Amino acid sequence: VTDRIEKIKAFLKDNPSDCFLNHALALEYVKAGDEADARAHFELNMNNDPTYVATYYHLGKLLERVGEQEQAIAVYEKGMERAKAAKDMHSYNELQAAYEDLAY
């Protein structure tokens, strides 16, 4: 995992706001158990490109794992709004299922 993290970080030096690379890096940090860095990169993605819908599901799941249910619910709600606006019903349904599992 560490080797992949280093490779992605090297790519990010050229384009630090690349959503795909930041998302990939966040997922690698999740695999490595580094939730603080994973969260930082998911949140960076949300700030850089709020329409990058994949971020919402994974950040929500991370927040659930660290016991921040209210924040996870808010992230799922925002993600559902974004997915609906993008007409991305697959992502919307995934976010809605995660939201309902947590909220009800």
Regions found by a protein language model. Give the residues of each.
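Canonical positions in the second alpha-helix
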Residues: 10-11, 44-45, 79
